[in-house]
Amino acid sequence: GRAFAEAGFVALHVQHPGSDAGIWQGSGNAGMALAAAAFDVMQAVARLRDGAFALDEALRRAARPGDPLRGRVDAARIAAAGHSYGAWTVQHLIGQRLPGLGAVPGLVLPDPRLRAGIALSPVRPQGLPPRIAFAPVAEPLLSVTGTRDAGYIENATPADREVPFRSISGVPQALAVLDGATHGAFADEAAAGPRWADPTYHARTAALCVAFLRAVLLRDAAAARLLAGGAPGLLAPGDRLEVKDWPV
């Protein structure tokens, strides 16, 4: 969020009661608490509703006289970003199908106000073949993962993290795989246990995310060329970056 703000973007952070840090704080078994929340269908739906609510509220406040957000939110240039369960949330907000759930009253998916998504540790779809699950996705997506980004709950492999990028077609995408990065490397939640407090890759991730948003939201040709060229100067030896259906 700090990197976005420093680059001139409004950055809003959304809390998800029932599936956020509160579920493991004070818990005797953080892993069990996380797993229970991850497989709770009602919490999944609540997360998607939270995303829609956050967009509603941001746009409402941007139009309200005297509000700090007044005039600061460009409704035509909104993106959503998240890590792990947050990545799952982003993927569905921009169009990934929800198997077996059908229409959710009061919730429009994909959310037509989103123009891009960023998924840190993307999540492979469950219950549908990937190409069917991702067929409705029509907005640019940046996927960031690591060579050791295995799942603690769903037994995801590092290769699974690349499935959204491999399965989505027809829209600009970028995939960054950071050498040595684990699932926890993108979280930096020391209070959740040592697995979530790995040395972070935040500087590289933040720089990639800013370049991606500049390229797809601001139509910044220099940022688009930077990513198309492998982002020299942003990545470390052993990292790799791919683009797909990229506008350069």
Predicted regions and their residues:
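Short amphipathic alpha-helix adjacent to the substrate-entry channel of hydrolases
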Residues: G1-Q15, A21
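Alpha/beta-hydrolase active-site loop signature
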Residues: G18-D20, R124, T182
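Alpha/beta-hydrolase active-site loop
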Residues: G28-A75, H92
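Short mixed-charge
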Residues: E57-D74, P99-P112, A221-A222, L226-G229, ...
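Residue in the alpha/beta-hydrolase core beta-strand immediately N-terminal to the catalytic nucleophile
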Residues: R77-A79, I118
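Gly/Ala-rich beta-loop-alpha elbow adjacent to hydrolase catalytic centers
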Residues: G82-G86, V90
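The feature captures the conserved acid-bearing segment of alpha/beta-hydrolase catalytic domains
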Residues: A103-G180
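Alpha/beta-hydrolase-fold serine-hydrolase catalytic core, especially in secreted/extracellular enzymes
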Residues: D179-T182, D188-V248
